[in-house]
Amino acid sequence: AAYAARAGLTCHVFLPDSVSRSKLKQVESYGAIIHPIPGGRSAVSAAAMEMAENGQCYYASHVYNPLFYEGTKTYFFEICLQLGLTMPDLFFLPVGNGTLLLGAYRAFTQLMAAGYLSDYPRVVMVQAAACSPLATAYAGGQAVPAPAEAAATVAEGIAIPAPPRGVQILETLRAMGGTAMTVDEEEILAARRELSLHGLYVEKTSAASFAAYRKLSAQRPELGQSTVVLPLCGAGLKSD
């Protein structure tokens, strides 16, 4: 919506009708035409694609556009540079549609080809327990996402019951030798409260990564000796 406003383009934004009011206000402020859609994010995507297929607009979804992953991979390039051309021992990545995880795979593969890495860093894929088609499939050794409902969760940004790139995400996580975790609602909210005490006000979806870190740290105290990166992708005002 912001880029379209700057370019003088009409922007149609499709959102779940349950989206937080704070997110809605940001979109409205840019003058976008808002289409609230009943159901989960899959229903939203279907409605947007239908409009695009009718030739009325271009569907600028970050999920389907392959160039988007060329952008998310640079996040990991920056981390490599900031750590002196090395990578942390462990990443906790929140995953719904998988844009960050797929970008990580591109970055790691290219860094290995260039001689900066000898192997993939360890990756933990994090999902909300209320909506975890990928984590469930991974734990069960399945190649396709497990059936899931569009259940309500405070981590609305990763509540994707049928991720379009689900098979690719599972293949990618296994190729990297990663693992998967789920966190429940109270674990997410508790993690968010702790982050706030550190001066980091994040949206609830972002807190899911820290919740997984806290959970795994309780099981494996030695994790405190590792270099760990937790992406905090969204500001707190987005979910309040």
Cite the ranges covered by each PLM segment:
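Alpha-helix C-terminal capping segments
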Residues: A1-T10, Q82, T109, A211-P221
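Short glycine/serine/threonine-rich phosphate/pyrophosphate-binding segments
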Residues: A1-R6, R21-L24, Y69, N97-A104, ...
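Buried hydrophobic positions in well-ordered alpha/beta secondary-structure cores of metabolic enzymes
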Residues: A4, V27, I79, F91-F92, ...
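Small/polar-residue-rich loop-to-helix segments that shape phosphate-bearing ligand pockets
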Residues: C11-M87, Q142, A152-L170
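Glycine-rich ThDP/TPP pyrophosphate-binding loop and its adjacent helix/strand module
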Residues: I79, L83-R106
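Phosphate-binding loop/pocket of nucleotide- and phosphate-handling active sites
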Residues: S118, A146-E149, T172, A207-D240
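A glycine- and small-aliphatic-rich helix-loop capping segment at beta-alpha/alpha-beta transitions
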Residues: Y3-F14, S18, R106-A114, G141-V144
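Active-site/ligand-binding loops adjacent to catalytic centers
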Residues: S42-Q56, Q110-K204
